[in-house]
A protein has these predicted regions:
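Gly/Ser/Thr-rich phosphate-binding loop
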Residues: 14-17, 31, 36-44, 53-116, ...
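Short hydrophobic/charged patches on amphipathic alpha-helices used for structural packing
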Residues: 22, 28-31, 50, 58-60, ...
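Adenylate-forming AMP-binding core of the ANL superfamily, especially NRPS adenylation
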Residues: 75, 115-162, 170
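Conserved AMP-binding loop of ANL adenylate-forming enzymes
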Residues: 1-22, 44
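Beta-strand->loop->alpha-helix junctions that form or flank phosphate-binding loops
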Residues: 93-100, 121-124, 229-232, 275
Length: 309
């Protein structure tokens, strides 16, 4: 929640702006607040904008006071950004970063061309450094070549509290924070995020670590092995997919898995897609090829007639 606290709340405090807050996200309350308070900027993750645009009472509210805003926290679909600009009358900007590089590493500007604001995450901030490196060699990548996004500057954390080893894993000897995200720098100095090195799932702006869910599902009687990976989602960007290998002779249904999860783990961590398979894609040395699970999930959805939402 660093994005909201720093770029919204602190920004309002330092600029003498009024901040209109809602107790918890509700698209109807947000729309009504914009209409009543004549808000000039709106922040949120893509799923929030989707909920607002698709609310049945959307046309009842006047959005003409909006000038700009930030869409961040997850990959922002170009079509969604177009709809926001057309229907909410605001110039959307985006910010890329992570809590360890608060409040971000790069950002687009309100005066950037629409194509830049929709298809890139903009330039690095003043007095900071961003570079794209080859994850294998550590060498900086040329323009147009994909690599890992790294950051150094006042926005880079000093380290994880009382965790020097964990800190050393992400901040190198030169002070660069390694994000684990893949990106590309274009000829104009704008960056585009292309994927993630890490296995983390980003569902509607919430970061989900597969291992946590895997360890939990291992406790379900009858589960022999389990892997969790992100499955593309039109609404959330990614959804949680669980790939389960059962012990021989065990009969289990998707509802059994979800019932086991309810009340024990956060609702957004409960797998949306559950697949019972015989084996995982493996390397010759016996390592699970986790990156192949996403494609496997899409294939299984197609074969089983499951709609991707």
């Amino acid at each position: 929640h660093c994005f909201g606290v720093v770029l919204a709340t602190m920004n309002c405090l330092t600029h003498g702006c009024t901040e209109v807050m809602v107790e918890r996200f509700n698209p109807l309350v947000v729309l009504a607040s914009i209409h009543k308070e004549r808000c000039t900027a709106l922040y949120g993750v893509p799923t929030m904008f989707i909920a607002e645009l698709n609310h049945p009472m959307f046309d009842m509210f006047d959005m003409s006071s909006l000038r700009t805003g930030i869409m961040a926290g997850s990959l922002c679909p170009v079509e969604l950004m177009k709809q926001v600009e057309e229907k909410m009358y605001m110039k959307v900007t985006s910010v890329y970063g992570l809590t360890e590089a608060a409040p971000g590493m790069t950002a687009t500007r309100i005066d950037d061309p629409f194509d830049v604001r929709c298809n890139t995450v903009g330039h690095d901030f003043e007095h900071t450094e961003v570079k794209v490196i080859d994850p294998e060699t550590g060498e900086e990548c040329p323009v147009g070549v994909q690599g890992e996004m790294c950051n150094r500057g006042y926005n880079t954390m000093k380290g994880y509290y009382k965790k020097p080893e964990a800190t050393a894993e992400v901040i190198d000897e030169n002070g660069f924070l390694h994000s684990g995200d893949l990106g590309v720098k274009d000829e104009d100095g704008n960056y585009r995020i292309t994927g993630r090195i890490k296995d983390m799932i980003i569902r509607g702006g919430e970061n989900i670590y597969p291992r946590e869910i895997e360890e939990f599902l291992y406790q379900l009687e009858g589960v022999k092995d389990v892997q969790v990976a992100g499955i593309p989602s039109k609404k959330y960007g990614e959804a949680v997919g669980a790939f389960i290998i059962l012990h021989e002779g065990v009969d289990m249904h998707e509802s059994d898995v979800r019932d086991f999860c309810i009340g024990k783990i956060s609702r957004y961590k409960i797998p949306k897609y559950i697949f019972f398979i015989k084996e995982f894609p493996m390397t010759g040395s016996g390592k699970i090829q986790k990156f192949k699970l996403k494609d496997l999930g899409l294939q299984l959805c197609k074969e089983q007639g499951i709609e991707i939402v």
